Amino acid sequence: MAFYELRQYKVWPGKMDEWVSFMEKEIIPFQISKGMVITGSFRGEEDDSTYIWLRRFEDEKSREKLYADVYESDQWKNEIAHRIPELLDREGMIVTRIVPTPKSTSQ
């Protein structure tokens, strides 16, 4: 059964525009190139520290493969991962697995 990850991040003060640019120009295109399905990304309308994005997985096996393809890659380790802590409070990261309700259009 398909499920989503609702990923909520706390962006360091004054870093939201830089974070959004990094996500939209580097992280999201890279993850999509590895097969990740990104269904949306959002920033807080009134809270400039809140960034949320959604990723969809067909099942746990595909999630595990995609995680390995992304996070164990040389590009992630050498070009992307080290830049994240200067933009995000990793302690404030919340990842919630969610499933669509029966009548949801997000099956």
What are these regions (language model features)?
Residues 13-15, 59-61, 101:
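Residues that cap or initiate secondary-structure elements
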Residues 98-105:
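Specificity-determining recognition surfaces
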Residues 4, 8, 49-62:
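Accessory recognition modules or surfaces
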